[in-house]
Amino acid sequence: MADLSVRRGTGSTPQRTREWDPFQQMQELMNWDPFELANHPWFANRQGPPAFVPAFEVRETKEAYIFKADLPGVDEKDIEVTLTGDRVSVSGKREREKREESERFYAYERSFGSFSRAFTLPEGVDGDNVRADLKNGVLTLTLPKRPEVQPKRIQVASSGTEQKEHIKA
């Protein structure tokens, strides 16, 4: 990109202007986020605090897939975990605390409401042994992997002869 020195006005200090670069403009347009203004306080929802959406940590060990979510203030009776095929879903709600009309808040940034998250799992989850534990506001899902399936060798018999011998792996 070339810079041009252009003398403007009556002063003696030259001002620099940029030559138009279509590639630079294309890069700026690619980096532009049309929803950026939605996060501006002017457009914010003034009805109340944002919705409660817990963040998850998902990791894999040799034996299982481990999901962890911070759910402070959520009671275990308000959490539902379902496993359907290759999909695990976690949903629940965090209730708003009752407020007295005489109370005056200077800040109210806590979030409440219902949430639902779903994750697609790789093959091999042992759905019969899934565990869900809530301790100190942290939900831990343990989805164990099925034992590796060992291949079974099948003897190929020639046509017209009976297969009498079974070979075990």
UniProtKB/Swiss-Prot annotation:
The keyword Coiled coil does not apply. SUPFAM superfamilies: HSP20-like chaperones. Residues 1-21, 150-169 are annotated as: Disordered. One of its GO terms (biological process) is sporulation resulting in formation of a cellular spore. Residues 47-159 form the sHSP domain. Induction: By stress, such as heat shock and oxygen limitation. Keywords: Sporulation, Stress response. May stabilize cellular components during stress and spore formation. Belongs to the small heat shock protein (HSP20) family. This is Spore protein SP21. It comes from Stigmatella aurantiaca (strain DW4/3-1).
